[in-house]
Amino acid sequence: MNKEKIAFLVDSGSNVPEEIVKLGNMKVIPLKIIYNNEEFTDNVDITAQDVYDRLEEEIPKTSLPSGETITEMLEEIQSEGFEKVICVTISSGLSGTNNMVRVVAEQFKDLDIFTVDTKNIGIGSGLIAVQAYTYVAEGLDWETIKTKLEEDVAKSKIFFHVPTLEYLQKGGRIGLVASILGNMLNLKPIITCNEDGVYDTVAKIRGSKKSVQKAISLAVEFAGTAKKYHLAIAYGGKTAESQVAGIRAELKKQLPLFDKIYEGQISPALGVHTGPGLIGIGVCILEP
């Protein structure tokens, strides 16, 4: 198998590390961010900080990419001589992007398109794309790559510390009563995606510092006795970014068998639903 004949298509909600996007020459399908009077393209003409700066005046909506955008990207891939495509998207339980890709893919009879529903979001999904790139770079055959990626879905997890419930409530992710009660008690939820790929609150911790520590401990628990894994730190905004160095040091101490630690700002589309201050701790098990 010639690895040059396999292309990569990922969505912006997967927060694939920029270095991997460049190495794999990946095409990124952008989600949409919609305000009352204008529409932006995720990570193209709007940043996460832009979203945070405007949250007080307006909370935008997010939208999946258009079929036309996906069609154009697949046409480009085809014109570049690729025969196979690995497409990695955030959970179908959180977005219609995965289904949209599958529908559009049916039009391309000459392309062998394998679409991965990661059942995850953010870098939790992006770590699956890292694995896809790695398998292709290693020269694994097509069927083996597909099998391994399907297995990897259960091996990748991210735990989000969310500093306020306000934006999850306004975005319809949690109820108003839960939001008011949580904020009154200074409870910080730890959110992940469950096996069905939908948001699941796995803990509620009083105070931000303890909440971040809990996210780390949950990542440690998920890694278990694994012999090797990738780690990731996702952050939302400047305040969260200032905590990354300390979190990195803690992860190195508690999870020393890591192969690589990826770090990055969450996409603007994800920031819409969480607000600033989010910290995500991701793990992808490489060797159980």
Language-model region placement:
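Mixed-charge interfacial surface used for oligomerization/domain docking
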Residues: 2-7, 13-27, 32, 38, ...
